[in-house]
From Swiss-Prot:
Keywords of the record: ATP-binding, Kinase, Nucleotide biosynthesis, Nucleotide-binding, Transferase
Function description: Phosphorylation of dTMP to form dTDP in both de novo and salvage pathways of dTTP synthesis.
Positions contributing to ATP binding: G12, L13, E14, G15, A16, G17, K18, T19
Family: Belongs to the thymidylate kinase family.
EC numbers: 2.7.4.9
Any single GO BP term: dTTP biosynthetic process
Keyword hit for Nucleotide-binding: yes
GO cellular component: cytosol
Protein name, UniProt field: Thymidylate kinase
Catalyzed reactions per annotation: dTMP + ATP = dTDP + ADP
Single GO MF descriptor: dTMP kinase activity
UniProt-listed InterPro entries: P-loop_NTPase, Thymidylate_kin-like_dom, Thymidylate_kinase
Organism: Halorhodospira halophila (strain DSM 244 / SL1) (Ectothiorhodospira halophila (strain DSM 244 / SL1))
Pfam families referenced in this protein's UniProt entry, alphabetically: Thymidylate_kin
Length: 215
């Protein structure tokens, strides 16, 4: 019987440095000899999910209700789980996702003010008890994150256009999630320089690697 793969999620606000984090993980898995890890993202990961992602990020839908937003995210997630994440893990491959359900608790539950209860109902329905093996939370001051986004110079999507109160609420929701599940979460100070963040990332996943592949 094929051993199930490992599922790692990377969470954080806009400008937290998730790209740097994912690159560090990719290099680490390569060095450890992990075969064909799959890197994916949320919302997205499937043609259906990517179409919904485009709508969610489009500034023309700025007035979308919080409820519609949460339901759209979970519609994309249901397809992502069924078509990509679960089959890949069952085949013994590792899956690394740029955001997952903790982001919904943060952005819709916290930032939009829906609270945890309604998100939890959707999670139970869509997940059926499924949860990541490890979540790396890149904790960044919203002011720092927004400054990084502004320096990219590629325009702001619908969420990047939000202001500090939204991101402060999302950050607080992330912190509550991490405090409630310390075994799964590894919190990383993403305000630090890129090299230091990469080192924290490597330390955050090292124990998941096969013994011979650990640094």
């Amino acid at each position: 019987m094929t051993e199930r793969g490992c599922f790692i999620t990377v969470e954080g606000l806009e400008g937290a440095g998730k790209t740097t984090c994912l690159q560090a993980i990719e290099q680490m898995l390569l060095e450890a000899g992990i075969d064909r890890p799959l890197f994916t993202r949320e919302p997205g990961g499937t043609p259906f999910g990517e179409a919904l992602r485009g709508a969610l990020l489009d500034p023309q839908y700025r007035g979308l209700t919080a409820e519609a937003e949460a339901l759209t995210v979970f519609a994309a997630r249901a397809e992502h789980l069924a078509q990509v994440i679960r089959p890949t893990l069952d085949a013994g491959r590792w899956v690394i996702s740029d955001r997952f359900t903790d982001a919904t608790y943060a952005y819709q539950g916290g930032g939009r003010g829906l609270g945890d209860e309604r998100i939890a109902v959707l999670e139970r329905w869509v997940h059926g008890g499924f949860t990541p093996d490890r979540t790396l939370l890149l904790d960044v001051d919203p002011t720092v994150g927004r400054s990084r986004v502004a320096h990219r110079g590629d325009g702001e999507d619908r969420f990047e256009q939000e202001r500090d109160p939204f991101f402060q609420a999302a950050r607080a929701a992330y912190a509550r999630r991490a405090a409630a599940d310390p075994e799964r979460f590894r919190c990383i100070d993403a305000n630090r320089p890129e090299g230091e963040v990469a080192e924290q990332v490597r330390a955050g996943v090292a124990d998941l690697l096969p013994v011979g592949g650990r640094p």
